[in-house]
């Protein structure tokens, strides 16, 4: 059991028999009325995202989630294979479970896999990943009215928007949560 004061990103709640993870939360203290907590919850199994409001101080059931450090090894058909860093056991995870994170997965990348009762639930990439640009059009100085962006393809096949000065072969820092450009990696 946890109260709303214990809420943090990544906490897994049990609501109506289903597992939900908190992706965003905000404590709100209005001028009139009681305080409450506004949350954005993601269903661990289906990936569905919902907004839910809790009254301050309410007790909520939490799930025991074991996060293990793993390394992404390779893709085998529709499965992604991860190796546990503790016991070197390999865990093939289906594409549906890996989800959007597959866009930024590189072989040898350290990844956390969350388990509940021995069953893998989801993976957590590092917040920032370093990837190389494999293709982008050259940006011309006079082709915009204000600072602009252009599409770039990364070595994993993911496409993101980057500033015009980025060239093919540049190594970039990318936010793995939303795919946004964070900067160039100094070589």
From Swiss-Prot:
Pathway: Protein biosynthesis; polypeptide chain elongation. Pfam families: EFP, EFP_N, Elong-fact-P_C. One of its GO terms (cellular component) is cytoplasm. Its main location: cytoplasm. Transmembrane segments: none annotated. Signal peptide: none annotated. It comes from the Bacteria. One of its GO terms (biological process) is peptide biosynthetic process. PROSITE patterns: EFP (PS01275). GO terms for molecular function: translation elongation factor activity. It is found in: Cytoplasm. Keywords: Cytoplasm, Elongation factor, Protein biosynthesis. Belongs to the elongation factor P family. PANTHER family: ELONGATION FACTOR P, ELONGATION FACTOR P (EF-P) FAMILY PROTEIN. Involved in peptide bond synthesis. Stimulates efficient translation and peptide-bond synthesis on native or reconstituted 70S ribosomes in vitro. Probably functions indirectly by altering the affinity of the ribosome for aminoacyl-tRNA, thus increasing their reactivity as acceptors for peptidyl transferase. This is Elongation factor P. It comes from Mycobacterium tuberculosis (strain ATCC 25177 / H37Ra). The gene is efp.
């Amino acid at each position: 059991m946890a109260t709303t004061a214990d809420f943090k990103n990544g906490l897994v709640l049990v609501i109506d028999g289903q597992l939900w993870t908190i992706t965003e939360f905000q404590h709100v203290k209005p001028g009139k009325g009681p305080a409450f907590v506004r949350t954005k919850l993601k269903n661990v199994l289906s990936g569905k995202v919902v907004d839910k409001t809790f009254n301050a101080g309410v007790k909520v059931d939490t799930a025991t989630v074991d996060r293990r450090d793993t390394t992404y090894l390779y893709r085998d058909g529709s499965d992604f294979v991860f190796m546990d860093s503790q016991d070197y056991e390999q865990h093939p995870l289906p594409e549906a479970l890996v989800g959007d994170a597959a866009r930024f997965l590189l072989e040898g990348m350290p990844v956390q896999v969350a388990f509940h009762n021995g069953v893998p639930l989801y993976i957590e990439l590092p917040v920032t990943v370093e990837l190389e640009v494999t293709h982008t059009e050259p940006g011309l100085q006079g082709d915009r009215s204000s600072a602009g962006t252009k599409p770039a393809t990364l070595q994993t096949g993911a496409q993101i928007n980057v500033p015009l000065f980025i060239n093919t072969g540049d190594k970039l820092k990318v936010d793995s949560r939303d795919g946004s450009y964070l900067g160039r990696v100094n070589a």
